[in-house]
Amino acid sequence: MFAPLAVFGSLGWTEILLILFIALLLFGGKRLPSLAKDLGDGIRSFRKSLTGESDDSSQQISQEQERSVPKEETKTSKSKKSKSA
């Protein structure tokens, strides 16, 4: 139940609340959600790189390459048929 707090080690609730309060004072209420989102995105990409998962851009490139291969094959098969006729 408290597994996410294991990252903080021996920090108690009062220390965590104090850190959050200082972060609120430093960055303000408007920037704090965007900073938390950016931090979450960074952690997510770090975990993906550790597990070896590819990002969306490499998947899109591989899909585009797969789409282009059948087009090239159809061109070569048509040219072979026209040469044999």
UniProtKB/Swiss-Prot annotation:
Residues 50-85 are annotated as: Disordered. The keyword Transmembrane applies. GO terms for molecular function: protein transmembrane transporter activity. The chain crosses the membrane at residues 7-27. Pfam families: TatA_B_E (PF02416). The gene is tatA. Residues 64-76 have a biased composition (Basic and acidic residues). Keywords: Cell inner membrane, Cell membrane, Membrane, Protein transport, Translocation, Transmembrane, Transmembrane helix, Transport. Belongs to the TatA/E family. Disulfide bonds: none annotated. Forms a complex with TatC. One of its GO terms (biological process) is protein transport by the Tat complex. HAMAP family: TatA_E. One of its GO terms (cellular component) is TAT protein transport complex. The keyword DNA repair does not apply. It is a single-pass membrane protein. Signal peptide: none annotated. This is Sec-independent protein translocase protein TatA. Its main location: membrane. Part of the twin-arginine translocation (Tat) system that transports large folded proteins containing a characteristic twin-arginine motif in their signal peptide across membranes. TatA could form the protein-conducting channel of the Tat system.
